Amino acid sequence: MPVDVPPADELDPPGDPESVARTICLRLLESQARTRAELEAALRKKGVPDDAGQRVLDRFTEVGLIDDGALADGYAQAQQGRGLARRAVAQKLRRRGVDEATIGHAVSTIDRSSEYAAAQRLVARKLPSLRGLDPPVQARRLVGMLCRRGYSTGLAHDVVRTAIAGVDLLTDGD
């Protein structure tokens, strides 16, 4: 995920690397929560010495301005609410530089039943737009949609099979 960093001439004072690091981090944290890895990358990109950057990041972690665990937990819940499966959430957190233990804890807060229910909601929302297609085509498209959102193939087939069977039962009575 690219991180916007303010131009170097806006940073003051130019001679103190810790002050520059602090300014960069605070400006980035103003707009949204960031992982420690994202902030490290931004500092590296701006040429802040590693030791000065690490001291600032350590201090920000101490005071709670950087909390990868809280960010990962909130991100996992928000993304799951948008219909992403645990696997996709974990992949996005990895890309943001969150460590595996923290990712494991964050995705463990998403239980299987809520993941299944989210998949059902996605399928129910998409199914009406596929109404005129043959059931195998509907199934293929719905399974593909779920797999792209990180759901396992088995869960996707199960949810789609149930949804298409439910639609068939409703239309048989017409």
Locate the predicted segments by residue:
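An alpha-helical, amphipathic repeat domain used for nucleic-acid recognition
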Residues: 1-174
